[in-house]
């Protein structure tokens, strides 16, 4: 039986860490041999016991614009940058813990109101198990044949209200929940992943997760409860190249990311806001490079189908599902 290479690369994959409406953080692990790992869909890999992972992720969202006027007050959302810096630790072969600190930059067209700063710290626990005649926790050592078994993870996480939910923008200063630097209260997330390597070069990955929010009352007296976010993701990773002598691997990835947004409940609007929420299907094409103990992933993500809630005449510019494209890149290293 072939043995797996001793170098395991921990990499950033999209996991249900609570950074909703503000980008989604990522977790996972893979090696130069064995299952591949997508860019935006969480794999079912955990960190090796006693190993640390450092990761950085950027999700750059460029939005479509609809109003050609440059008059004051007509500025539309230009782009958002969702940065994340995180660290993970493998307490057991089957148990990994992560902490992620996001930093958001939200920029309007020239003359608009911008927002930037650190947002709510997120924590996550990932428990890994597999099926080999029976369900079991992931063991410390697995052969390449063992890695072809179905692997799963259960993910539990929350965000802590460390960001400034009452961050103000404009003149006179106002609080815009969509550009706030936090949710004001903890949010909670949970999810499942499943991974199956079905050939030497091909791996299928599936993910289901959900994020729930609490109502928060701002200093202005208004309150907001963001709608629940549900994600269903599927991905195929194909190994394009491996050079063991250089500890190098290159994978190509194709993904479908489905996002269901619940309606926001804003105290300034009677009942759930009719111009929020809906369904979005994103297509993702990406590459992942592995070298030594490092990994770099890059992908283009675009909405290919949407069914957004809106009242007649509402454009929803700057909303999820209205992007021209999203560029996602992740870098991670294990130590």
What do the PLM-derived regions correspond to, one by one?
Residues 37-39, 50-52, 56, 81-85, ...:
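Hydrophobic, lipid-facing positions within transmembrane beta-strands of outer-membrane proteins
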Residues 23-31, 59-83, 170-183:
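Surface-exposed strand-loop-strand hairpins of Gram-negative outer-membrane beta-barrel proteins
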Residues 65-73, 220-335:
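Outer membrane beta-barrel transmembrane domains
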Residues 19-57, 61-65, 130-153, 164-165:
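Outer-membrane beta-barrel biogenesis signature
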Residues 56-62, 99-103, 152-160, 206-210, ...:
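Transmembrane beta-barrel strands of outer-membrane/channel proteins
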Residues 52, 94-99, 131-135, 201-204, ...:
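Repeated loop/turn-to-beta-strand initiation elements of outer-membrane beta-barrel proteins
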């Amino acid at each position: 039986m072939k043995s797996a290479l001793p170098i395991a690369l921990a990499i950033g994959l999209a996991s249900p860490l609570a950074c909703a409406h503000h980008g989604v953080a990522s977790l996972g692990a893979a090696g130069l041999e064995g299952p591949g790992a997508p860019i935006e869909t969480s794999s079912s890999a955990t960190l090796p016991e006693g190993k640390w992972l450092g990761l950085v992720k950027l999700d750059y969202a460029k939005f479509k614009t609809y109003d050609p006027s440059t008059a004051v007050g007509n500025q539309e959302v230009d782009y958002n940058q969702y940065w994340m810096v995180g660290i993970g630790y493998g307490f057991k072969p089957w148990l990994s813990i992560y902490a992620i600190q996001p930093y958001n930059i939200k920029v309007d067209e020239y003359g608009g109101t911008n927002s930037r700063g650190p947002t709510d710290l997120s924590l996550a626990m990932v428990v890994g198990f597999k099926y080999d005649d029976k369900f079991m926790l992931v063991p410390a050592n697995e052969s390449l044949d063992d890695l072809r078994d179905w692997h799963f993870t259960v993910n539990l996480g929350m965000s802590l209200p460390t960001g400034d939910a009452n961050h103000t923008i404009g003149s006179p200063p106002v609080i815009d929940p969509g550009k706030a630097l936090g949710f004001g209260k903890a949010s909670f997330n949970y999810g499942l992943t499943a991974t199956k390597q079905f050939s030497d070069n091909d791996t299928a990955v599936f993910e289901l997760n959900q994020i729930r929010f609490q109502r928060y009352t701002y200093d202005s007296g208004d309150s907001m409860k963001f709608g629940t976010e549900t994600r269903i993701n599927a991905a195929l990773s194909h190994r394009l190249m491996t050079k063991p002598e250089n500890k190098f691997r290159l994978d190509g990835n194709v993904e479908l990311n489905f996002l269901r947004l619940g309606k926001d409940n804003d105290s300034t609007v009677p009942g759930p806001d009719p111009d929020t929420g809906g369904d979005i299907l994103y297509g993702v094409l990406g590459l992942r490079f592995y070298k030594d103990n490092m990994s770099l992933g890059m992908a283009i993500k675009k909405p290919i189908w949407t069914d957004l809630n809106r009242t007649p005449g509402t454009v929803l510019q700057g909303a999820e599902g209205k992007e021209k494209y999203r560029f996602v890149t992740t870098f991670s290293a294990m130590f």
